[in-house]
């Protein structure tokens, strides 16, 4: 059984579905191909901005490779949840195997097609959307949230350590 607060959050997400889809399209339209160093800093900056809009202190951390994005919503809670994601994608080649251009998000039969839509920009945004919806509906989270997003997972995370 779903509690009433959860129903309110889900209703908010449903009401703002197009806004969230548009944000996912924006993320997927931004290339972030780590193997080709294509669009990495721009994507990191987009994520930093989203964290800031959620009320966190988003910042880029230089690594010698692609930047890490770090942020925190500090609610003074005893517990902290860390959300790890990566923002890089694999190269889109070969292009001829795509039915639509990989960095032009397209909805077909209710599904969004674009490079990174499921690995990993959709996953990253689903967590951020949950934080956004909770805060808009219920106010302050009962926990602190740390956001960590790296830009080299698809090439073995050489600067993670």
Describe each PLM feature range.
Residues 2-115, 136-143:
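Acidic/His- and Gly-rich active-site-bordering loop/insert found
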